[in-house]
Amino acid sequence: MSRKDGVLALLVVVVWGLNFVVIKVGLHNMPPLMLAGLRFMLVAFPAIFFVARPKVPLNLLLGYGLTISFAQFAFLFCAINFGMPAGLASLVLQAQAFFTIMLGAFTFGERLHGKQLAGIALAIFGVLVLIEDSLNGQHVAMLGFMLTLAAAFSWACGNIFNKKIMSHSTRPAVMSLVIWSALIPIIPFFVASLILDGSATMIHSLVTIDMTTILSLMYLAFVATIVGYGIWGTLLGRYETWRVAPLSLLVPVVGLASAALLLDERLTGLQFLGAVLIMTGLYINVFGLRWRKAVKVGS
């Protein structure tokens, strides 16, 4: 990977890591489902008038939009709104990698290798440590924690739809898929917000919207979604997947660091242990025992 593309990849990692802090800031003055609906409305409009619709079956596009866009962010925004720390959310959301592996095995008959099973087992242990900390110390609201896991599972379901879309005969451009799939969750978000929050709350949040919320929406829509996914998709198309995908492991590192610096969030001892176990599980899933093999060859 060239130095320029390496810098771009790290830029996306930082942008996505900060994403969780921005969500928490944006939720201070707006209901979570309303904020999510406005985010995707800004992603879709006016870009949808300038980007061609991806030539994929409508049922796959709907499935992708309802899982990776609607369900994932409905659960994630509500989780953070209910007290899930932004930094910890950035880490727990990475459970999507393991959900994706298990769904891939079930849906496509993909074989699970030893390193994947070891990574999954270690990450599950890390999640159980976090649950234990939540139940005993109440440092993390259990509802927020479970909603974040639901968001991770929804992301994994979206990955399965994405795999089906990308294996289609007419493989769509990344930006086309991002923008057109953003159209799908807008109405569901607003309807859900209307049911759960009420029209008075929705109208009040729009009438009293402040610059902080506006900037949060701009960041979430244009920087994190359009710019972030645009660069990431370009890099995936330019290089082998194994060169690009592992860099996403740095997202929760940035998420935890930025939450500590900007929101003064601190991990308890058990939370830190759970975080280390999950990150180690992710590392094993991606790299396996490659480091150990390299040491043997070198010696």
Curated annotation (Swiss-Prot):
- Domain EamA positions: 14-132, 153-287
Molecular-function GO term, any one: efflux transmembrane transporter activity
Q: Which Pfam families match?
A: EamA
Cytoplasmic domain ranges by topology? 1-6, 53-59, 109-116, 162-175, 238-243, 290-299
Membrane-spanning ranges: 7-27, 32-52, 60-80, 88-108, 117-137, 141-161, 176-196, 217-237, 244-264, 269-289
Q: Which GO terms describe its biological process?
A: cellular response to hydrogen peroxide; cysteine export across plasma membrane
Query: What is the membrane topology listed in the Swiss-Prot or TrEMBL record?
Result: Multi-pass membrane protein
Periplasmic-side stretches of the chain, per the record, are 28-31, 81-87, 138-140, 197-216, 265-268
In terms of superkingdom, the source organism counts as Bacteria
Q: Quick check: keyword Electron transport in the entry?
A: no
The record's section on InterPro entries has: AA-Vitamin_Transporters, EamA_dom
- Keywords from the UniProt entry: Amino-acid transport, Cell inner membrane, Cell membrane, Membrane, Repeat, Transmembrane, Transmembrane helix, Transport
For this UniProt entry, what's an example GO CC term?
plasma membrane
> Cystine bridges: which residues?
none
The protein's location, in the record's own words, is: Cell inner membrane
For whether the record's keyword set contains Disulfide bond, the answer is no
NCBIfam families found in the cross-reference section: PRK11453.1
Q: What does this protein do?
A: May be an export pump for cysteine and other metabolites of the cysteine pathway (such as N-acetyl-L-serine (NAS) and O-acetyl-L-serine (OAS)), and for other amino acids and their metabolites.
Q: Which family does it belong to?
A: Belongs to the EamA transporter family.
Q: What is this protein called?
A: Probable amino-acid metabolite efflux pump
| Species of the source | Escherichia coli (strain K12)
Provide the gene name from the record: eamA
